[in-house]
Amino acid sequence: MSAARAKVVPRRTVLTGGAAVALAAAHAAGAQAASFKALEQRLEGGRLGVFATNGKASLGHRADERFPMCSTFKALLAAQVLARVDAGQETLDRMIPYGPADMVAHAPVTGAHLDDGALSVETLCKAIVEVSDNPGANLLLKTVGGPEGFTVWLRSIGDATTRLDRWETELNEALPGDPRDTTTPRAMAKGYGRLFDGAVLSQSSRRRLEDWLVGATTGLQRLRKDLPDGWRAGDKTGSGARGSTNDVAVFWPPAGPRIYVASYITGTEVPMDVRNAVHAEVGRIARAELA
């Protein structure tokens, strides 16, 4: 018998080792669930929905429940416009005219340039992602066939869940149980994954979308708060009625795959700083568990 023969591991040892791994995984999942439930309790009756993934592992809480999207749809809208540019159906330098009749609340870019009477497609995309400009979103929605055209595009890239039914600012109504203008945390996080890991966008369009998300200023107190050294992040927030406060982020760790996190809150009256703190803790948990 050769001395180099591989050592035979007893079957009982293999089974015991496998059970230990399964037990550890179950314990970790239980700890995550407890953490998210504790965070949800801070909302005093509100709901928290979370899904985070690095493409291999994931974690979640109410991941398949519907939540009002509010402005988190705008990053996907910008991606749809970029996909049209990639397909030769749109150009970033095309000027889109608009006037006072197009104005709605929260217009940091379109309002500042109202006297100019037009802005480029690229400027509008940047505005809706970085500062969540509402008239800009409506102007771009018109170029893709409205909320229906946006939803049809989502179906074409594999999102069977997310739906947009109305325009800004009516889409932020957030009525309990209303399926209009909603998504699930799982659908949104996976949607971001398709944009950066799939074939939806060209490399140049992915870089442009990444720049806009990283340049966003509305979510610095949410998922991106207390970002560790060496990490990069971009996000798109959303806020609406009934305490609806959302954030969807992409994290780039110092090493390893991107992490996509969707965190949604609705049905609460706690102050904004409490809601932001819940999102910040979700971000911390996702980074700790998935990096």
What do these predicted regions represent?
Residues 47, 138-192, 196-197:
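Mid-domain, small-residue-enriched loop/turn segments at the edges of structured enzyme/sensor domains
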Residues 103-140, 147:
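Conserved catalytic neighborhood of penicillin-recognizing serine enzymes
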Residues 43, 79-89, 100, 129-132, ...:
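Sec/Tat-exported extracytoplasmic proteins
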